[in-house]
Structures are given as C-alpha cells and as structure tokens.
Amino acid sequence: CYGDLLQHLTGSKDHNVALREAAVRQGLSVSEYGVTVVESGEVRTFATEEELYAFLGYAFIPPELREAAGELEAAREGRLPVLVEPGDLRGDLHSHSTWSADGKGTVAEMAAAAHARGHEYLALTDHSHYLREGRLEAQAEEVAAVNARLAPFRVLRGIEANIRADGSLDVADETLAGLDWVVASLHTAFDSSPTERILAAIENPHVDCIGHLTGRRLSRRREADVDVERVAARAAETGTSLEINSQPDRLDLRDAHA
C-alpha cells in the first residue's frame, strides 16, 4: 500500500479531507492503509498514487495542486492545468550577482550555470543603488565579454529599480531606456499606498516587470496590502509582466494569484 501511504503523507490535510469526503459519497473509505469498499469490506491497496487516484475516478493530481481548491473536480473533469517544469524554462529574468551585496556569484559564474542548464538567456538585474557612479557602465563591459564567450547564450543587461514612496523610480528614464530588461520593485514603505505606487511604476514605458509584487518575506514580513486584481488588469493593458518569484522565502506572486 505504498501509494496509499505516500498520498496520505504528502497531503495537504485539506486535500485529504476533501478526498475522503468525496470517497464516502461513493461508498468508499480512504485511509493510509488503502481504500475500503464499505458494503463488502473489501480493502484495495495501490502501489502508486496514480493507481489510487484512478480507482477513485480522478486523473493524477500533482502534489503542488493538492490544496482543496477545486482540484478534485478539475481532475474528474479533465481540467487540471499543465504545470511548468524546470525543462520548460528558457531563462531567468531576475538575478543578482556580486555587483549587489546579496549576490553570490559573478556574472561569468551565473551565466555559465544558466548556460549549463540549457537556458537561452539570463537577465542581470542587480539592485540599482549598487550600480551608481559608473558601476553600471563597468558592468556592461563585463556582460559584453561574457556574451562574446557564450554566444548564442545571452546575458541581458538589466536592473532592479526601487519604487519610491511617491511611485517614481530611483533610476533616470534615460538610463532605463538603454537596458534590455527593467524590474521595478517595492523595497521600502510597504504600508504607504503600495497599489498606487505599483500602478505608477507600470505606467513607466521602460518598466518591463514588477518584482515580488506584495513584498512578503515568509516568517519575516507580511505582504503589503496590494490590490492584485487591479494591478494585474493594468499590467495586462500595458504589457507589463508580474514576476512569480520562487525564492523559498518569497513565493510572490502566490500560487492562487498565478
């Protein structure tokens, strides 16, 4: 009954409760030990989760979707979404190198790692306040050298600009215009009109993406009170991307947003 036990321990709890309640309506009892046909007392066990879900009338539900958020109905009706897998990724559009204090690798090291993964590009988006006084231009020379060595792989010249309290960015428009990819993010004053500030950043024609939209840091900082639907609607109108930041302490946008 490995499949039964694996499914039970994988959870989530809410998903398992919903699964068991649905099974009861079919005259079945689901536990980590197997599926019992209530009328006959017969116990069925399964070697895999796939076999268990199929017996209950569902397509296999990936663990990431097991949140009691309509996935059982979707699995029964063949409407489960196709999940993005690592092999689907063509590149990373938000990265920090040692040009920023929070970066761990050099431009060359990061580009080599991305290239080794089969990616086609890497956007270098170091924090704007570390790229002043000629440092952005010096970084451009380093990027050019890496690109010459790894072509056709390409490091995109970018930046992560701060959205100020008044909604303006801390980088001049003429500087942003010369870059390949611009991320704008909230890093301060999270309680000061975050929705309006993000909307102002979206209106900047040089901004390609809003980074970690709500600014949350799990176990460290709650998410800002951002009207996600309003922001998403305007982003769609302007063609501005909203980042899904998969850093374990961010997960921002959240799965429900995506």
Language model: regions and residue ranges:
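Active-site mouth loops of central-metabolism enzymes
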Residues: 92-109, 185-191, 221
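Phosphate-backbone recognition surface of nucleic-acid-processing proteins
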Residues: 1
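Extended substrate/RNA-proximal surfaces in nucleic-acid metabolism proteins
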Residues: 6-89, 134-238
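C-terminal structured "cap/appendage" subdomains that terminate the fold
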Residues: 244, 248-251, 255-258
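Metal-associated gating/positioning segment near the N- to mid-region
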Residues: 101-131
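Residue-level detector of anion-binding/catalytic polar loops
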Residues: 29, 120, 241
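Histidine-centered catalytic micro-motifs
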Residues: 88-103, 124-129, 209-215, 246
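Conserved short loop/turn motifs at secondary-structure junctions
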Residues: 38-40, 127-133, 246-250
